[in-house]
Amino acid sequence: MQKSTEQAGEWQEIWERRGALDSFIDWGRTTYNHFFRRVLRRYLNTDSTVLELGCGRASLTLSLAPEITSLVGVDISDVAVQQASEFAREHHILNATFAIDDCTKLALTEKFDFVWSQGLLEHFEDPIVVAREHYRMLKPGGTALLSVPYRYSYHTLWYLLTRPKMLRRFWPWTEQRFFNGRQLLAVGKEVTPYARVFFLHPLPLGIIFLELRRPVTE
């Protein structure tokens, strides 16, 4: 409980903070969302029910909300949940709801066709616990997709360069790890044999995906 409380406080501070660096991050997120949408649309249709874990402002999934049946977003930060909810209201998106929840032990009882997270898994000491929660939320035949920064990319270099205390403010997120393909697949295989990894193209974007598929019958 203490660890979850500490983590909630860290992310609360991140989502409340605004500045020049955060404006740059917003621009980068908009750029990445263009490529993420191409990937997510492979999994979605008008009947899809979608859950986003660690949704933040949910800018990506809200942009896809008109193309699906429903969207539920959860985050440990009430500031992030409030911002996502306000964005949905302002843009008259009626099929999206947001709630505060802990991605290591979700209170949700509903199951979904598609479970998504963007830049979430790498912030946890035990990523397998979080990956299992993604899988647990799936309907039979559903798919979970988790995106993380690739270990051998500019993301890692940026992180390492900002480790000195005086430069720490130039890394806008909490502490994290970086996965290569083998390590990320090992996490997935602890959850289900129906796991695979693949890269976001173009490769210089430095993003790798973990896909977890739930069989129709188990």
PLM regions and their residue ranges:
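Conserved N-terminal segment of class I S-adenosyl-L-methionine
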Residues: M1-A107, F114, Q118, A131, ...
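Short conserved AdoMet
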Residues: N45, A65-T69, E125, K139, ...
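A short linear boundary/processing microfeature
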Residues: F87-E90, P140, R163-P164
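Short amphipathic alpha-helical "recognition" segments used for binding
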Residues: G56, T61, E122, D126, ...
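S-adenosyl-L-methionine-dependent methyltransferase catalytic module, highlighting the catalytic core
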Residues: D22-T31, F114-W116, E125-R136, T143-E218
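Short glycine-centered segments of the SAM/dcSAM-binding site in methyltransferase folds
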Residues: T49, G142-T143
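Active-site micro-motifs of SAM-dependent methyltransferase domains
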Residues: K105, E122, S153
